[in-house]
Amino acid sequence: IQQLLAQEPKPDHIIIETSGLALPQPLVQAFNWPDIKSQVMLDGVVTLVDGPALADGGVAHDLDALEAQRAADEELDHESPIDELFADQIGAANLIVLSKADMLDEAGIARARASVEQQLEAPTPIIPVSGGAAPMDAILGLEMEAQAHARSEHSHHHHHHHDDDH
C-alpha cells in the first residue's frame, strides 16, 4: 500500500482483491496502522458470494476443490473451518455481491439472499450481478468509516459460528 501511495499521481482508489480464502479482519486492521491511516481511508469491504451454491444450500459448488486450493496456497496463514471463514467474510462486509445471478431464477436469488442474511449481524446491502459485471458506483463510495461506529456498537463482542462456507 505504501508503494502505491508513493506513486505520482496518487491513486484515487485502491481496490484489493483477496483470495476467497482470506480472513478480511487482518487486512481491515492494517488500514488502522498510523502510517497507513494518515494517508488512506478504507472505504469498504466487498464480499463476493456464489449465488448458485448458496441457493443450493452450500457456499461453494466443489468443496473438495476449495479445500485443495487451501492446501496448495503457501501464503494462507490460517486453517479456519470453511464455515467460520464464510461467517467472517460475511460479517466484515459492507456490501455483498451475489455472483452468477444470471444462473438463478427469482426463487434461487431469494434462497441465496436468505442464506446470506441469516449470517448477518447488521443490515448489509446484497446486490445480484450477472456475467461478473458489478456496478462500480455500488462498490466505490461505501463510506465504511461512517458506518463502522454503528456496526461496532451493534456487534461488539458478538461472535457467531455457522455451518456455511465460502
Question: What label would you give each PLM region?
Answer:
Residues 1-84:
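Nucleotide-state-sensitive switch-loop elements of NTP-binding domains
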Residues 66-166:
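C-terminal accessory "lid"/substrate-recognition subdomains
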